[in-house]
Curated annotation (Swiss-Prot):
Compartment annotation: Secreted, Extracellular space, Extracellular matrix, Basement membrane
Domain Collagen IV NC1: 246-470
Hydrolase as UniProt keyword: no
Organism from which the protein derives: Bos taurus (Bovine)
Region (Triple-helical region): 1-238
Stored Pfam families: C4, Collagen
Full protein name: Collagen alpha-3(IV) chain
């Protein structure tokens, strides 16, 4: 018969045994490129080798910084070896000759000299007049009668002859011994002071400090409340009868009290004690004995600077001003002082007018020197000569000026102020004073020494300000 229809598919048989690996097939057609999804972040790699140094960066902007706050005091350094003996300075110019003194009083007469040698015999003089008749002799025996004689005429004696000529003068006698010395004549007037000696060799220039960053200007503070009315002052001295002659000097109290003028002088005005200023890294000092050191207004930056472009700038640079200070204690945290808190730290001063010039006399010992004859004392103090601060800049004080004789001694007699409105004491501020000297050790090598607080006044020279008395 015919073949039957195809039957249904049977069940799958059991898997066969693994066949032998067939030959490698021909390469297939390239597949379609489909971007896959981003894989997960891999683990961090190991540290790579250091790269080559990059090129130098551009220069920074030239911004001047402000001075940092005062740091803590360092440990005292070891004592250095003694310095070598310095060269002897050149002698000063000779002073002008003094005015000749008045002639002394006449001395007592000297002793008589020895008698001179016997003179030569003089010429014979004319015969002198006859002498008086002699006494009668004894009566002789009678003579023999003579012959009659002639009449004899007896004439009268003639007049005396002229005196004989004077004999030749005798030889000069030996000089007598010198008479006793005469009384000393009165002292001549005081000679003029000699010319100033040549200036000393300048000291080494200090290293320039780093400029700090300029701080942002803070907002102006609000005005404080007005202070209470002060008590009335003491009654001043009576006015002098004489007319003032225009001799002006300044007196500094080194406290917050306004000083009074000495007796016999009159006040012109009062103010605040300016010592020196520093601008563009250059310092200029004021003579404390003149009225320029007594400003009637106080500010931490009393000056401004202008350029050739007709532009002026105020309180916008790293400039300084320095003022005589008071004994007020600085804050424990050494923070800069600003605003109304500055008032207790600034010394007051008074400008006075006197009838004559005022000078300072320095003893260079711990004894107060006397005023010259004909001068009166105005005040006594300590011999102040020089001061330096930021950038080793500073100024000196004329020793003839009343400003070189401060009535109070302090190792830090001035305070530093800045244009940003703050003031403080800093470790690079130094004061220089005349030392007390032993007259027996002149022209000898000074003995190095270090004197601590409590004994400082024992090595500082004393001084006195004197004024010429009115005639």
């Amino acid at each position: 018969g015919l073949p039957g229809r195809k039957g249904p598919v049977g069940d799958a048989g059991p898997p066969g045994q693994l066949g032998v690996t067939g030959p490698q097939g021909a390469p297939g057609f390239p597949g379609v490129t489909i971007p896959g999804q981003k894989g997960d972040r891999g683990p961090p790699g190991s540290r790579g080798n250091p790269g080559m140094p990059g090129p130098p960066g551009p220069p920074g902007s030239p911004v001047e910084g402000i001075k940092g706050d005062k740091g803590l005091m360092g440990e005292p350094g070891q004592r250095g070896p003694p310095g070598a003996i310095g060269d002897m300075g050149s002698p000063g110019h000779p002073g002008a000759p003094g005015v000749p003194g008045q002639p002394g009083a006449r001395g007592d007469p000297g002793f008589y000299g020895f008698p001179g040698m016997k003179g030569k015999k003089g010429n014979s003089g004319f015969p002198g007049p006859p002498g008086p008749p002699g006494q009668s002799g004894p009566k002789g025996p009678p003579g023999v009668r003579g012959e009659p004689g002639t009449v004899k005429i007896i004439s009268l004696p003639g007049s005396p002859g002229p005196p004989g000529s004077a004999g030749e003068p005798g030889m000069q006698g030996e000089p007598g011994p010198p008479g006793p010395p005469g009384d000393p004549g009165p002292c001549g007037p005081k000679g003029k002071p000699g010319e100033d000696g040549p200036p000393g060799t300048p000291g080494p220039t200090g290293e320039k400090g780093n400029k700090g960053c300029k701080g942002e200007q803070g907002p102006p503070g609000s005005d404080g409340l007005p202070g209470l009315k002060g008590k009335p002052g003491d009654t001043g001295p009576p006015a002098a009868g004489a007319v003032m002659r225009g001799f002006v000097f300044t007196r500094h109290s080194q406290t917050t009290a306004i000083p009074s003028c000495p007796e016999g002088t009159e006040p012109l005005y009062s103010g605040f004690s300016l010592l020196f200023v520093q601008g563009n890294e250059q310092a200029h000092g004021q003579d404390l004995g003149t009225l320029g050191s007594c400003l009637q207004r106080f500010t931490t930056m009393p000056f401004l600077f202008c350029n050739i472009n007709d532009v002026c700038n105020f309180a916008s640079r790293n400039d300084y001003s320095y003022w005589l200070s008071t004994p007020a204690m600085i804050p424990m945290d050494m923070a800069p002082i600003t605003g109304r808190a500055l008032e207790p730290y600034i010394s007051r001063c008074t400008v006075c007018e006197g009838p004559a010039i005022a000078i300072a006399v320095h003893s260079q010992t711990t004894d107060i020197p006397p005023c010259p004859a004909g001068w009166i004392s105005l005040w006594k103090g300590f011999s102040f000569i020089m001061f330096t601060s930021a950038g080793s800049e500073g100024a000196g004080q004329a020793l003839a000026s009343p400003g070189s004789c401060l009535e109070e001694f302090r190792a830090s007699p001035f305070i530093e102020c800045h244009g940003r409105g703050t003031c403080n004491y800093y470790s690079n501020s130094y004061s220089f004073w005349l030392a007390s000297l032993d007259p027996k050790r002149m022209f000898r090598k000074p003995i190095p020494s270090t004197v601590k607080a409590g004994e400082l006044e024992n090595i500082i020279s004393r001084c006195q300000v004197c004024m010429k008395m009115r005639p």
